[in-house]
Structures are given as structure tokens and as C-alpha cells.
Amino acid sequence: MAVVGNAVPCGARPGGARDNGSPQPGSRLRPGLAAGPALIANGDELVAAVWPYRRLALLRRLTVLPFAGLLYPAWLGAAASGCWGWGSSWTQIPEAALLALATICLAHALTVLSGHWSVHAHCALTCTPEYDPNKVTFVKVVPTPNNGSTELVALHRDKGEDGLEVLSFEFQKIKYSYDALEKKQFLPVAFPVGNAFSYYQSNRGFQEDSEIRAAEKKFGSNKAEMVVPDFSELFKERATAPFFVFQVFCVGLWCLDEYWYYSVFTLSMLVAFEASLVQQQMRNMSEIRKMGNKPHMIQVYRSRKWRPVASDDIVPGDIVSIGRSPQENLVPCDVLLLRGRCIVDEAMLTGESVPQMKEPIEDLSPDRVLDLQADARLHVIFGGTKVVQHIPPQKATSGLKPVDNGCVAFVLRTGFNTSQGRLLRTILFGVKRVTANNLETFIFILFLLVFAIAAAAYVWVEGTKDPSRNRYKLFLECTLILTSVVPPELPIELSLAVNTSLIALAKLYMYCTEPFRIPFAGKVEVCCFDKTGTLTSDSLVVRGVAGLRDGKEVTPVSSIPIETHRALASCHSLMQLDDGTLVGDPLEKAMLTAVDWTLTKDEKVFPRSIKTQGLKIHQRFHFASALKRMSVLASYEKLGSTDLCYIAAVKGAPETLHSMFSQCPPDYHHIHTEISREGARVLALGYKELGHLTHQQAREIKREALECSLKFVGFIVVSCPLKADSKAVIREIQNASHRVVMITGDNPLTACHVAQELHFIDKAHTLILHPPSEKGQPCEWRSIDSSIVLPLTLGSPKALALEHALCLTGDGLAHLQAVDPQQLLCLIPHVQVFARVAPKQKEFVITSLKELGYVTLMCGDGTNDVGALKHADVGVALLANAPERVVERRRRPRDSPVLSNSGPRVSRSTKQKSALLSPEEPPASHRDRLSQVLRDLEEESTPIVKLGDASIAAPFTSKLSSIQCICHVIKQGRCTLVTTLQMFKILALNALILAYSQSVLYLEGVKFSDFQATLQGLLLAGCFLFISRSKPLKTLSRERPLPNIFNLYTILTVMLQFSVHFLSLVYLYREAQARSPEKQEQFVDLYKEFEPSLVNSTVYIMAMAMQMATFAINYKGPPFMESLPENKPLVWSLAVSLLAIIGLLLGSSPDFNSQFGLVDIPVEFKLVIGQVLALDFCLALLADRVLQFFLGTPKLRVPS
């Protein structure tokens, strides 16, 4: 058997694997073993590299061997030999021995835990690279970027059909098998998706049971469901996370330091919080699990007859019957339609509200090879979709006919390999979720750790000067100081801010699947928009037909000639459902409505407003993106005769059809270009009389015979009006210091016109990049009116963008990608319109902007945008219609509208359009309506996005089609970001004050009682809770928030405020000491029972006052969130804290003071404390505001 080769990531740059921290197996292999190429096929969509490993025996693992075999025995040996200078008792452990043991235990714990935190570390610690296929037990699978995280998976061994052993593994529900004979690589299971049409047309399914068993073994079952882990498994995963482990460690230290109440209170809070997150995770997983198809019986042609088979037992290669199901069952897998026609509702999969027509391949050329990219839209029915109507195969023709009168289809893919399965995998394993425990948080903690180490070192050095002091207790205190820089409540506080925004967005009909992306919305620099259906409306308006008269004059539809009528009435893919509903492309519906013809179920069209014969559609050659045209064969009865006269009708892109016309107007190109510049959509129409044809000729006629020698019958001109609020929203986004970019598949001239209308473009000329017409020629920038022509090489993109607006087409992008990718990367940030781009190119634009360091937002709808939405920092998917459940819940007799708390209102009926509140409405009615809406919303829990809810791969989904949601997301993002940053400032100040209190003051005998620590913790928790409840302001400000913690303003304000607090604390401490009895002993007894004293009471009151001051001073307020007086809960929380401080200072309740271990303070000293507190507050506030004025306003980095 062939040997598993050395695994090197394919396509990675040298050292690429080291970038992600994976251990590199040695390049030199054992003698006698052949070194094969990379273990994964180059260009695999999911897997980048595979590394083979063998699990080590328990005692040989690095998590056990160095510790059990070396470090612990060495420590015990040193203790036994008296190296540590051991006393007579085990209680008198020398500090060196204690430090050594603690260090070994900590290193051991971290080593074990690092295996939980990192797959690469786990492999290095517990496995060894192995190249002998007989010994390999696991493989480490590294996915391609943005496709989940690295996993260590078991390697399975099965017997193949030829009796040889086959190695395979499963990664993210996809099976990979090792090809030992040819490629020496792991390959995904090959599904029958690239054969010639003759293979499918002549296929008769599985004839023998042995073939079925072999297929089941190769492809697995047709199940796309996930197993929901139990509570304990998920909780264990969270309980071993770095933050949680650290927090539990801190709680343990506090318990050792006799802070029992505080420790138990904090630990309970942590466990409850993590448990609630696990419950929420389990609920979400259960919802996702329900999205998979439910098994049902389906007719399958096996062993030469039709028989009912459970849908989860279907395998690729089966012939199945597909049709409309009375139980509304979904299509169980991806199938190729062989015979019969279907109308399919794909909304459950793509969010596309328009049902799609699917055509069979029975009459297509047998030599043509199935291309899923090109053929899927027309011939493949995807799993998870619903057949709303089907036309069974004609009885007169030969071939298979299902017993249930369904359509005949060939099974292509099953399980998680289907389109629906891929979407489910995206939800389960896709882009790594953004969490609170990010790199910035850790760097921030390391910054604070510097001060903590200095404080701990001071305690150790000063504390060890007293020979009688317990070194164990001193070591414990030093450890506590080091841990104090990471507040245990940090993740909770970050989550609180995010959850507040989550609830606010839910009330605005927005659903978020990745809540920790919300702060990224506050950092957004570039906002990218799709055009069709996002910026422009779906309600299309047919302006008329151009090119029939002189120049670009548009003829009204009522005055067009009969040939144009026939071309428009017949050349479409529309279908009528059983209930009379017309389904198909909105553009084609608008055209048929404009000419006022009626379509019937049997493919006939009849005029309503003009007197002429009806048409019967015989053959459709559907629109394809590559061909940019559609043609049909139709017929009408001659007057006074039953003879049929056949016609050809063609419509498509004007530049494509030009060569097909026998003659056309001399200003043909000028007309369609000029109209496109005005923002209209233009399609050329062709017509041809074919005369009499036999039935066989009509059935066998080729597309080429229709698409030649055509008569030009006009340009159909369709306007796509902008959505009512697009202009206002884009203006608001631009005024808020964002760069806006359009990324669309539409015509560049139309796209540029819309961009100009929306003020994306404010330059006099827009240059479009034209790739060379011949090889070797340079690319050219050409203005829309062709008055400016510049070579691409002339000047830098930045200089060019200062004078002109730039538009890049899909062709231009593809050319630069192939010729000069570096120049393309420099150009992308300066382009304002990307037109005629394919879905993959949209994704490329977004990932390129991210690579260049820009925080990007993508807003779009439909399947074309899924990749871009998934990879953007903030992806917002718009739904064309609000979900029915929301609509039905809100129907009232008056059908009153819903008011969002940002101004615009949205109708409860899907038929009503978005509008602004009329200024005449009384404020009271506004308030009543708002309160009613909020009551309605509170009745529902936050919904889980279902597969029908559009681009489920997007982190944000808006249930309304207005782009107003982008403003809501940015407002909430900025508010959350500012809240998060101010929390970090507050935590930093509190941590620094605590480090000083626990070091210098601790050695002077100042410490807090358990009750004091608990009261302080409760008051602090109240302030943190309400500071996270801040709401954004109604309008976006031009000022941008600081994007991260590490900036000059944050560092300086923290250091200056700390200096003010530090000096105040030192001054009051010394004043209190001067008023206290002199110390008799040289060294303070740090371990005696807590005793109230003037010094302790002064420091405690000062510490509480400073903590409350940090909240009041560092609360940001306008322009990103409501001001402090408007945040009533926080004001009340600060007021309660202030009253508590004043009460404790004045001693208004002696019993209360006594309970919390405070002594009576002399009156004159109370005045001193009060004055110092006031001065401390004023100086810290002044320092922050001055720094804010000079350093606190960042500028937009992107070229504008």
C-alpha cells in the first residue's frame, strides 16, 4: 500500500504553516518511506493542509513525562536531601521550595490546558508525526481561511471494493478518502456532478442491491442534521476557556485570603453567567438542528421498478420522482431534472422570494457536460427547496414515468454536500466567531500587568525584610496583586454592553447571529452596498420602447408595433401557478404587465388591449449570464386558417444582440449607451417570422437557428426607482465619516448613474477601466462620455481618485488579477463603483479591503451576496419581505404601523411601504404608538434566524428591506464600542488603584473587611450594569469613535487620572496616619484579625469615592450615546453610591458604620476628606476633557 506523504500546505507561501502555529514535521523521513506530495488536493475549497499523527502512550506525552518523570521527583529529591533547608516540620516550608513547587504546578496546569485551547499545542504535546499509513491514528486538518478552525480528527480504516484498506476522515461533516494508487492525497468523495448529459439521460438507477450497498458505503446516508451536545459537554468547554480558568483561580486565592462572602458571590455569578450562555447555545443548536430536512417516503427507481424509499436512504446515482407534495415536503437532496418541469420555491435556501422555473435536460445535446456553475439555476433542484408546481413528462414520449405522476430526476449530492448542507455547515463551522476574549483585551491586560508586577515585587521585597512573616501568606498576597489586573467580571461586562444592543436591534427587526460583531459596526470605515433590491426598489417601471423613432426617443408601450408586442409577450420565463399567481423574474412580470397580455397555464399568451392573435410558446432557451440573452420559439394561428405561423423572439444585452440583427439603426450603440447613462435598464428585442414548421422541426430546432437574421424591434427601457429612503440614508452614512462603495452585477453605466443620484460620486467625470481588446495592449481609463482616455499606468490611483470618480468592472478586475494583482490591491480602496462583478469577485473586493486594514460593512440581498456578506467585518442581509409570523402577530383592525425608536416607521402589512411620520401627528399619539409597539415586542423572545430568512451566513439579518437598518447597526455599534472602551478605562483605573492599595497600603496594615469588599463590589456591579445600558443618540455624528484601546488619548487619560487619584490617596493616608496613635512595633502584623481604624476607614471611603468618580468622569455621552442625566438608571446608581459614601463619611448611622468596620472620623478631618474628594474629582475630570479635546477625535483613514 502507498505511503502517506509528508504534509505541506498546498498553495501556502514558505513558512505559511508556521504562521498559524502548526508544528512542522521534520523534512527528513524515515529510511524506506517514500515522501509523497501534499496530502490534500491543491485548490480544495475546505481543507488547506493535512498532517498525519500517531497518539503517544499516556506516560510518553509531554503533558505527563516532563512533570511526572522529572520535575516532581526532582523537587521531592531536593526536599529529601535537605537542599531547601527544611525545618523540623512540614508546615515550615522554605519560600524557595514553595515558589518552586507553585511554579511546577502552574506550568503543569497550563501545559494541560494549552492542549484544550489549541489543537496545534495538543498535537505537539500528545502526538508524534507519523508517515507510515499502518500506524497513523489521527490527522490534524487545517481549513482554508474563513472556513472554521483546525481540528484533530480520527483516521478511519475500511475495506475498499478491491479488498484493499482505505483511509478516510471526516472534517466538518465532509468525508475525505486517501487515494493510494494515483494522487497519493486525501480527496473529498467524488459525486456524479461532472458527467456528459448522455450519462444522466440514459441512466436507469441502481439495478442490483450490491450497487446500492457500495454507494451507501461510499457516500453515506442522506442526513444533514447535527447532534446537540449535552449540557455538561458544552459547560466543560466553557469552563476550560482561559478567562474562566483564570477567574476561578482568582476566586480560589481570595478564599485563601479569607474573603469568603466576596469569593462565593463572584463564583456564583460566573457560573450562572456561563450556564445561561450554554443554555442559549443549546437552544440555538436545537433550532439549527430543526432546519435539516425531515425524512419522508419518496418514489425511487431501483432494480428496474419504482418503489417507496425513505428520503434519508437515498444515495447519489438514484433516479427519483420529484413533484409537488400535498404534505409540503421539501426536496431531500440536490437533483438534476431529467424529465418534466417544475416551479420551485427556493426561499427556504436563498431568501429569494421569486419561485424559479426548472427545465429538464432530456432534449439537450447528449455530448454537453454538466457544469454546475452554469446549469444549476435552470436544471438542478436543490435540497431544502419546495416544489410549488410540476408538469409531469408527456405520456407520448418514451422514457421513465413515475407511478406518482412526478418528474424524473437524478440524485447528484446528498447530506451535508448539498447546497442546503453547505449552508448549514457555514452556520456550524464558518467564520470564526468574534468574541470578547480577543487579542486587544489580552494586550490591555499585559499593559496593566506591568504595574501589578511592580507592586507585587515591592510587597515581596519589603515584606521579606520582616524575618517572622509567613512567606506563604506573603506569596499569596503577591499572587493576588498579579491577578487583580484582570477583573473577573470583565467578560460579563463586555457581554452586557453587547446584549443591550442585541435587544435594541431585535426591536428594530434586526437579528444578529454573532453578537460580538456589534462593536465592529462602530469601527466601520467602508460601507459597501449591492444595487438591485438594496438601493433600488423591486417595483420596476417600464418606460417604453426606444429605437423605433429618431434618436433615443422612447415610444409608449401603447404605440409600439405588433412585432414588438409579440417579442415582449412571448420572450420570458414566467409561469402561472394553479391558483393563478404569476411567478418569475420581476423584470419580465413588469414587461408582460406593461404590454397588457395574459399568460395561461398551458403556455399561451393573449392580448387584452389590442386586437391580434394569441401566441403559444413551444420552446424556451433560457437566459444565461454567460450568453446575456434569451430566446423562444412561439406560434400564432393565421387569420381565417388553422395553420400555425412560427416566430422567434429574442431579448438580451444590446451589445450581444447587435451581431444577430440583419439590420439595425445607425445610431444603435449611441441610443442604448445614452439611455443606460440615465440609469435605466436597457434590453434589445429581436423578432423573426419562421413560417410553417412540422412538429418535429419545432421540437428539434436549435438555439442558433433562432438567434440569427433577426429584425430589430426596439430597446425595452425599464427604470429601477430608488427606494424611498436610500438617498437620505446614504447622506447620513456619508455625513457620519464613512466611505460608501457600490458593488453590483449590473451594467456599469446604470450603476454609475445610480451612484451619482445617491451622491456616492461627487466628481465631474467618472472613469471606467476597460481591459485591453487585444493581448499586449494596456488597460485604459475611459470616461462615460469617452471625452477622457487615460492609460492605467499613468499616475497613482490616489492622484487619479482626487480628480475623478473610478469604476471597475468585473472584466477589468479579472484582467488585473491575472496581470498585476499588486496594482489591483492599490487600486481597490480608491474605486467607488464595482459593476458587472460576479459573486466571487464581490467576495474578493471585501476580503481585499480587509487585507488592507479597512473595517468593512457589506449590505446586500439574494444569493449573489452571501460570500461577501460572510467575509465582511459587518455583513447585513436585507429581506425582501418581513417574515409572516411578525406580520400576522401585528395585524390589528386599524392595521397601525410600527415605529422604530430611531424615527422611521414600518408598516405592519407587507403591502404598505415605508414612510416617515407626518409632522402634523401629535406627540402624544407618537408616544402611545411607541409604547404599544414596545409592548408587542416584549411579548416575543428574540427569534432564531431560520433557513428561509435570507442569507443566513450573514452575521446581521434585517427583516425589513430598507437600508435604514445600516444606520441602526452603526449607531448601536458606536454606542457599544464607546461603552466597551469606557469600561476598559474604568477597569484600568480601578485595577491601578487596587494594585497600590494591595501593595504599599497592605504592608502598612491597611486592608478591607469581607463586608466592606462585598458592599464595594455590589455598588460597583450596579454602576457597571447601568453603564452598559446606554442608548445611542437618534442621529449619527460626523465624529468617529476611537477604534481601539491602544491610543494616545486612552493611555494618557488613564495615567493622568491615576496620578490625581494616587496623590489624593497618598495625601489622605498620611493625614489619617498623623491623626492615629503611633505604631509600637517595627513591622506590622499582616495576619491578625481585621480591626477598624481611622486609616482603614479613610482609605476605604476614598477608594469607593474614586471608583464612583471614574464612572462619572469616563462616561462618554454625546455624540455617540445619551448624556449622563438621560441615563437615569446610572444616575440613580451613582446617586446611591454617593449617598452611601456621604453617609459613611458623616457617620449618620453609627450601627451601619460599625457593621462595615468604620470608626468615627473627627469633624475637622471630615472636612479635609470632603475637600480632597471634590478636588480629586475636578482635577481628574479636567485632565480627561483636555485630552479628549486634543486627542480624542480620530480621522477617517480611507481616501475620500
Curated annotation (Swiss-Prot):
- Compartments (UniProt record): Endoplasmic reticulum membrane
Q: Could you tell me which residues belong to the region P-domain?
A: 509-538, 724-882, 946-961
Query: Which InterPro entries does the record match to this protein?
Result: 2TM_P5A-ATPase, ATPase_P-typ_cyto_dom_N, ATPase_P-typ_P_site, ATPase_P-typ_TM_dom_sf, ATPase_P-typ_transduc_dom_A_sf, HAD-like_sf, HAD_sf, P-type_TPase_V
Q: What is its EC number?
A: 7.4.2.-
Q: Where is this region: Arm-like?
A: 883-945
Xref: Gene3D superfamilies: Calcium-transporting ATPase, cytoplasmic domain N, Calcium-transporting ATPase, cytoplasmic transduction domain A, HAD superfamily/HAD-like
> What residue ranges lie in the Extracellular compartment?
85-92, 262-440, 1007, 1069-1092, 1150-1162
Stretches for region Disordered: 886-928
Sugar-modified residues:
N284, N417
Region (A-domain): which ranges?
196-227, 292-432
The reactions it catalyses are: [protein]-with a C-terminal TM segment(out) + ATP + H2O = [protein]-with a C-terminal TM segment(in) + ADP + phosphate + H(+)
Modified residue annotations for Phosphoserine: S896, S902
Segments on the Cytoplasmic side according to the record's topology features: 1-63, 114-240, 462-985, 1029-1047, 1114-1128, 1184-1200
Name one cellular component (GO) term: endoplasmic reticulum membrane
Region N-domain, as annotated, extends over 540-721
In this chain, Mg(2+) is annotated as bound at D530, T532, D861
Query: Any idea which GO molecular function terms this record carries?
Result: ATP binding; ATP hydrolysis activity; membrane protein dislocase activity; metal ion binding; P-type transmembrane transporter activity
- Ranges of compositional bias, category Polar residues: 898-915
Binding residues for ATP: D530, K531, T532, F623, R681, D746, D861, G862, T863, N864, D865
Functionally, this protein is described as follows: Endoplasmic reticulum translocase required to remove mitochondrial transmembrane proteins mistargeted to the endoplasmic reticulum. Acts as a dislocase that mediates the ATP-dependent extraction of mislocalized mitochondrial transmembrane proteins from the endoplasmic reticulum membrane. Specifically binds mitochondrial tail-anchored transmembrane proteins: has an atypically large substrate-binding pocket that recognizes and binds moderately hydrophobic transmembranes with short hydrophilic lumenal domains.
Q: Which family does it belong to?
A: Belongs to the cation transport ATPase (P-type) (TC 3.A.3) family. Type V subfamily.
Q: What is known of its domains?
A: Contains a large substrate-binding pocket that recognizes alpha-helical transmembranes, which alternately faces the endoplasmic reticulum lumen and cytosol, while remaining accessible to the lipid bilayer through a lateral opening. The translocase alternates between two conformations: inward-open (E1) and outward-open (E2) states. Undergoes a series of conformational changes with ATP-binding, phosphorylation of the Asp active site and subsequent dephosphorylation in a Post-Albers cycle (i.e., E1 -> E1-ATP -> E1P-ADP -> E1P -> E2P -> E2-Pi -> E1).
What is the protein name stated in its UniProt record?
Answer: Endoplasmic reticulum transmembrane helix translocase
Organism expressing this protein natively: Mus musculus (Mouse)
Q: What is the lineage of its organism?
A: Eukaryota, Metazoa, Chordata, Craniata, Vertebrata
